[in-house]
Amino acid sequence: MALNEIVNLTVPSLPAYVSVVRLTVSAMASRCGFDIESIEDIKVAITEAVTNAVVHTRGNSSSKINIESSFNYLSKQLTIKIEDQGPGFDSSHIKIPDISKLQSGGLGLFIIRSLMDEVNLDTTVGQGTCIVMMKKLGGK
């Protein structure tokens, strides 16, 4: 058996493809032995990340979203990398949301970080965004 399983997916930056990515990654997580609660967390995080990519590329069908999901059997870790071709943004402005002043939008990254074991964000204005999310089999 290989030490890593890798699934690569490139989809148009359209809302209809959010579910395709979610189903693909959740099927991989199930195959690798994640429990239902962890799979649901992964599905919510994927939905948030891919929806953000679609929104920030303005649903431009010529723009693509690249997804790489990999599971390492030694570290027992699922890693999901999502890259878009959007405008990027200045990540220094990201703040912890004030729950008492909730508004529509702005919670995606907060939700992703609360559900996944590790999250790394690489974004530069004018160069798109890459988010890498990790979930360990059996929790932290």
List PLM regions with ranges:
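Conserved beta-strand-loop-beta-strand hairpin that lines the nucleotide-binding pocket
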Residues: M1-N8, A53-K140
